[in-house]
Amino acid sequence: MASGCKIGPSILNSDLANLGAECLRMLDSGADYLHLDVMDGHFVPNITFGHPVVESLRKQLGQDPFFDMHMMVSKPEQWVKPMAVAGANQYTFHLEATENPGALIKDIRENGMKVGLAIKPGTSVEYLAPWANQIDMALVMTVEPGFGGQKFMEDMMPKVHWLRTQFPSLDIEVDGGVGPDTVHKCAEAGANMIVSGSAIMRSEDPRSVINLLRNVCSEAAQKRSLDR
């Protein structure tokens, strides 16, 4: 089976002038991991930050927090080693951004990180299938990547369901427009790693939102287990 349900706040919607404090606030509120969006202005139109910021966060937050790097970059091969040195735990690259996923997967592992593989909404999930047994996590985007605060795309749920059916032990992450009103759809389809940005970051009580998301996800996982 996939690992248990985990909630990873996306810091894209945080106060970037106080990024370290915002990350600490999320961890203190019960976040299982931090989802860090790296954008280069080429693969997606927005620009965020790179490995120097990740290195600074690692120094401030210590070794315990799990950094899930969502690499929305046109040359993911270029940043594997810098991110590993900076303290990243998982390197999630986009299938659309490389011509040689196998070599990239190997390089990520050799640099001591877990491997995530992401697909945009317009990419068929079957293209991910040949690599599913070589990765730790599949990320199904539920918005067009590049900006936070977008509307959840429910028509991505068949991709999640197909992956869960075909690869029961794979960690499956959803990212984009996920919050209390949409998490049940993701969980019922089979997602066990939930990225949520605005719903958590802008809440006056982020702990309660994180707990709600985790509980919905866990209940759906238990139901799938009983239904088998």
Curated annotation (Swiss-Prot):
Family affiliation: Belongs to the ribulose-phosphate 3-epimerase family.
Entry keyword annotation includes Manganese: yes
Assembly notes: Homodimer.
Domain of life of the source: Eukaryota
Function: Catalyzes the reversible epimerization of D-ribulose 5-phosphate to D-xylulose 5-phosphate.
GO terms, molecular function: D-ribulose-phosphate 3-epimerase activity; identical protein binding; metal ion binding; protein homodimerization activity
Disulfide bond sites: none
PANTHER family: RIBULOSE-5-PHOSPHATE-3-EPIMERASE
Annotated protein name in UniProt: Ribulose-phosphate 3-epimerase
Catalytic residue positions: D37, D175
Binding site for substrate: S10, H70, G146, F147, G148, G149, D175, G176, G177, G197, S198
Catalytic activity, as annotated: D-ribulose 5-phosphate = D-xylulose 5-phosphate
GO CC terms of this entry: cytosol; extracellular exosome
Amino acids binding a divalent metal cation: H35, D37, H70, D175
InterPro entries linked to this entry: Aldolase_TIM, Ribul_P_3_epim, Ribul_P_3_epim-like, RibuloseP-bd_barrel
